[in-house]
């Protein structure tokens, strides 16, 4: 089975039913619009939207869960997708924080991928360590055998943060820049540096260096482009 990763664009529509994006619509109207937006988007990839598990960017429980066909909603921050998942698709919500995708193989060659969203709170609460530990548990692979992909996100001169949120020195040491009484975070460096501490091979860490605040493919609150994209992961027999 081939691991496929694909990302919605602004042209595909806002991947959310939140009122803040559609203030004039009723709850029923927002839900209907969201359902139809998902169906249209996934139909382009020949994926049944009923087989899609949404990973909300509000999830804060730093635990992992293996996705199965019976799962409809999740509260965990990390979802695990196996190559035997029979067409299930995990779609992670993305606005200003990167989606993190990590993969590892078992001794018999089967693949497992972890999907999570690198919000400040989740990273501060050792999300990356839990991703590594979850893949070790599922595959018995060593951290240096794992591969990480980090999606587009704001550049280091765009992501303004409150220093009070960065309480975990293991994650945030030497990752901020002060300019005109404002603090900006180099979130890519924070992720890279933390993964190195977790004994991940630096040659196996891949970043999409696109600045999501300026690139027109992506929604971004920081870039005054309110909305959400979906970063989607699925195992299929063919490349999508």
Language-model regions, residue ranges each:
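Short, well-ordered amphipathic alpha-helical segments that serve as non-catalytic structural scaffolds
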Residues: 31-41, 125-139, 190-194
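Extreme N-terminal starter segment of soluble prokaryotic enzymes
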Residues: 1-5
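Short helix-terminating capping/connector loops at secondary-structure junctions
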Residues: 46-48, 139-145, 200-202
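C-terminal accessory segment of soluble enzyme catalytic cores
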Residues: 160-240
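Glycine- and Gly-Pro-enriched alpha-helical subdomains that act as flexible
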Residues: 99-182
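Intrinsically disordered, low-complexity, positively charged segments
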Residues: 7-45
